[in-house]
């Protein structure tokens, strides 16, 4: 299977519940939370810990990647393409201040998912796809006080590029 075919297959699996980890320093507790999320229906776990040391982030990312492989879920590393590559994650998610989608793609290669935060902005999503992103995050799906409801275009933006045009919006 070619690398781009592998990426398309991974992106096609990026449907359903997508869980993002909390900042938890206890690796065993974090892995237990991730296992519970997968047991509850999460199809992907995005490892995100903004305050951990590099060593802790690598250890936790490795543990989550192993869990996701064992349970058939996708593993995504937040903000750090080099870490995603080192631990063998299925992909990386980059925000506005985490470097470009193109540089993340260069680090993780063509077979992994590269997602990008688009902050509910269609031009940002279009740019991310042009740079090689396979998944764009449009905003939170949970109801937040004072947060507007997601529009149809926002929902479309949150779909992996491989799923667009397949009647899933």
Give the predicted meaning of each segment.
Residues 132-169:
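Active-site/ligand-binding-proximal alpha/beta "capping" segment
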Residues 1-101, 106-121, 125-134:
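Conserved N-terminal beta1-alpha1 strand-loop-helix module at the mouth
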